[in-house]
Structure formats: structure tokens, C-alpha cells
């Protein structure tokens, strides 16, 4: 059976009862030149080495170094690296968290999950070791671009074996890969599933393509109804003063409180994965600098009511985090006002895409966005429990449990 790299996997690998044996067999049949290590974080890897695997990304080495210095509550960060002959050939950020298995339950099902957690916490909450980061829009699992297809397979096999051995040493039973982008998951899905990982649909990322020459051109691209709604929201917003800044000196606490207020008013609750360190905005803006980070601030009568953190790349603007005061922000339609300012910012920078995260899907689709799929992989290190996980996986996909995504799927299928 061939995987996406054109390499041949052992016959019957999907029927492996012990993924650890699969990894050892795969690794034994390949080159033994790979060395796996677990640095204290991405920041402990040489910047040039990391940038070679992930060139021109705002969520790059400087970003990870900043967030690793002050992780959000409940998380511990490391990295995992594979080298050969002293050269980094594969790497990924690594996180540790006590994960609630009921996290996908949202909307009307959320009280059931909370009841289970209160009643049987040891059944619901488990230590997890995962590739990726709660603070990145996708899992940065990367490979040296000079590797051949078969060498990538070898490097990935070594990385997975190193991850399993680390989990065994630390007594962690659940392994995960958070938010692997669809285009990056396809070539390695066979290897991951052969190693015992199951996959479920994660929360997709909203992306607005920008083949437009102006703000007016963008608005004309919307449907008549959505165009009318957007124009009305902008017209009735009132006297909103907008400012784009690259320094938040003196505003750090206020900006963090805007984010926290928005999180508290959300209809959804993804627990630890939504939390930020109080130092996040200060540290990240300072680390990335004005070439990589900016904030849109919205004030009414001098009072700061909303903020939007943007990351800057050559062809993409990442609308990273949004915060707003309630109810004043809604009264002034600040979601729409700040959205348009973000689109203007992206157009002014010549960006081809405006990426706006994993929230407010229905509204963002009305504003022209599409949804890029993301995948979550997981494996229990006990084979019997892992088989149960594999069977249960389709039932707990995030796109089924998230009420907004479920409604979008229903409308599409209907």
C-alpha cells in the first residue's frame, strides 16, 4: 500500500494491533541515522534551522519563543526535533495539557460535558502530549525541503517513535496532533493511521480570498443581501474612531481584558485552548515587531471598545485575535467595522488572503470567506482503548459537535 509520498508501507499496516511495534518495525527497516531530541521549546532550536523548515511565517521562530516564555494556564510547551548528521530535518512544537474528552460537546450538549467532568473527572480529563500549539492556527510539523519523499517518511517515523518513547517515560497515554492543515495531512495520513492514529475533523479556518483591487470591489463581490447588510452595519455604526498601531505600550492590560470579555461572552467554550497568558499581547507584539504585527483599535468617544490583532506575511494577513466590550461593541457594530478595516489593511499590503481563525463561521461566510479543513489526530497508547477511540472518532468530530458548523453542514446537504 502506498502513502502520499509514493513510499511503500508494510502490507497490512492498518491492522496493526500495537502501533508501537509498527513504529519500531518501520524505523528498523529504514536508515538508522536519525537522532530525535526534545528541546525546551521552538526557541531552543536555532532560528535559522527553524526558518528553513518554515520560511516567511509570522507564526515563526520569534512567535514561538515569545509564547513559550509565558504559556497559557494549563499548558507546558516543548518541541520535538529530528536531525541527521547534525542538520535539522524535521520538527514540530510540542504541548502538554490535561485535556477534557468532552471538549467537542458544545451548544446544548455543553451542560452534559460539564456534568460528566464534575461527576467523573478522572474519566473525562486526561494528560495529553501533542504536536502543534494552542496558540498557532495550524500544526507546524515541518520537514527539510531537501528531503526526498522516502526520507520524509523516515524522518516522520523517527519523530513518531520519539514521541511515543517520551510519552512512555512520562506516563502519558494519549497522543495528539492538533490542527494539521488538509494539504499537509494528505501526504502523511497513511503513515499516521498506520502508527495507530485516528483522525477527526477539527475546527476549520476561515479564509477570505482577495482577488480585489479595492474595498468597493470586495463589497461588490458579496451577494445582494449580504452586501446590503454590511453597508447598513457600517452606516449605522456611529462615530467610531479607528487606529492601526504597532505598539501597545500602556494598553496591554486593556487589550487583554477586551479579549477576555469576548471569550466570556462566547456561545462556545473550548476550555484551556482559548486561554491566553496576560503577557500574550505585550510579548508577541514586541517579539514580532512592526513588520509582522499590528493592531486595529476602535474607540467611541475616546473609550477603547474593540481591538483586532493582525499578523503580517507577504501574501497573507492573519486576523489572529479579536476583543470587544459588551454591549457597547455590538451597539456600534464593531465586528463589521473592524472586519472592513482588516480587509482594507490586507488590500493595502497586497495580500492575497485574509485568514480569520476558527470562530463566527456563519458571519464570515456571509462576508465571503471559505472554510479550510483542519484535522485532529489522536492515539491512546493502550491498543484496546485505542481501538475504541478509532470507532468513536466519527461521532465526536468538531464539525459535528460545534452547533454553528453543524448548521452550515445541514444547509449545504439540504
Task: Set out the residue ranges of the language-model regions.
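A conserved beta-strand-loop-helix scaffold within acyl/acetyltransferase catalytic domains
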Residues: 26-110, 174-330
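Active-site/acyl-donor-binding loops of N-acyltransferases
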Residues: 22-33, 96-97, 138, 180-182, ...
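Hydrophobic alpha-helix feature that most strongly marks membrane-spanning transmembrane helices
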Residues: 260, 264-267, 286-289, 303, ...
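Short, Lys/Arg-enriched N-terminal segments with co-localized hydrophobic residues
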Residues: 13-24
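Acyl-donor binding region in acyl/amide transferases
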Residues: 75-78, 83-84, 89, 96-198, ...
Amino acid at each position: 500500500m502506498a502513502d502520499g509520498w509514493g513510499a511503500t508501507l508494510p502490507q497490512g499496516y492498518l491492522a496493526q494491533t500495537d502501533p508501537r511495534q509498527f513504529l519500531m518495525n518501520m524505523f528498523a527497516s529504514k536508515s538508522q541515522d536519525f537522532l530525535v531530541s526534545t528541546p525546551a521549546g521552538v526557541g531552543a532550536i536555532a532560528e535559522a534551522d527553524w526558518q528553513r523548515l518554515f520560511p516567511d511565517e509570522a507564526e515563526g521562530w520569534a512567535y514561538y519563543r515569545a509564547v513559550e516564555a509565558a504559556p497559557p494556564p494549563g499548558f507546558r510547551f516543548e518541541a520535538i526535533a529530528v536531525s541527521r548528521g547534525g542538520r535539522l530535518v524535521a520538527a514540530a512544537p510540542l504541548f502538554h495539557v490535561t485535556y477534557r474528552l468532552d471538549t467537542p460537546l458544545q451548544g446544548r450538549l455543553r451542560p452534559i460535558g460539564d456534568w460528566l467532568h464534575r461527576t467523573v473527572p478522572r474519566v473525562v480529563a486526561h494528560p495529553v502530549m501533542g504536536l502543534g500549539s494552542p496558540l498557532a492556527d495550524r500544526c507546524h510539523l515541518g520537514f527539510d525541503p531537501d528531503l526526498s519523499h522516502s526520507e520524509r517518511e523516515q524522518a516522520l517515523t523517527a519523530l513518531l517513535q520519539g514521541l511515543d518513547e517520551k510519552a512512555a517515560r512520562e506516563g502519558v497515554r494519549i497522543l495528539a496532533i492538533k490542527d494539521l492543515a488538509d494539504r499537509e495531512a494528505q501526504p502523511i495520513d497513511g503513515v499516521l493511521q498506520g502508527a495507530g492514529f485516528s483522525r477527526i475533523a477539527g475546527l476549520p479556518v476561515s479564509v477570505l480570498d482577495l482577488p480585489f483591487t479595492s474595498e468597493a470591489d470586495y463589497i461588490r463581490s458579496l451577494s445582494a443581501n449580504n452586501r446590503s447588510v454590511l453597508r447598513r452595519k457600517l452606516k449605522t455604526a456611529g462615530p467610531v474612531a479607528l487606529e492601526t498601531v504597532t505598539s501597545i505600550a500602556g494598553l496591554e492590560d486593556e487589550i487583554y481584558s477586551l479579549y477576555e470579555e469576548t471569550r466570556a461572552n462566547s456561545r462556545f467554550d473550548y476550555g484551556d485552548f482559548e486561554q491566553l497568558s496576560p503577557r500574550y499581547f505585550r510579548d508577541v507584539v514586541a517579539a514580532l515587531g512592526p513588520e509582522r504585527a499590528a493592531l486595529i483599535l476602535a474607540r467611541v468617544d475616546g473609550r477603547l471598545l474593540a481591538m483586532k490583532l493582525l499578523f503580517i506575511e507577504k501574501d497573507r494577513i492573519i486576523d489572529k485575535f479579536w476583543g470587544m466590550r459588551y454591549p457597547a461593541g455590538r451597539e456600534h457594530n464593531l465586528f463589521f467595522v473592524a472586519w472592513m478595516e482588516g480587509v482594507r489593511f490586507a488590500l493595502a499590503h497586497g495580500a492575497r488572503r485574509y485568514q480569520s481563525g476558527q470562530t463566527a463561521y456563519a458571519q464570515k461566510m456571509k462576508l465571503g470567506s471559505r472554510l479550510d479543513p483542519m484535522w485532529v489526530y489522536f492515539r491512546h497508547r493502550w491498543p484496546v482503548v485505542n481501538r475504541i477511540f478509532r470507532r468513536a472518532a466519527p461521532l465526536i468530530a468538531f464539525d459535528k459537535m460545534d452547533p454553528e458548523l453543524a448548521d452550515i453542514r445541514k444547509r449545504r446537504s439540504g
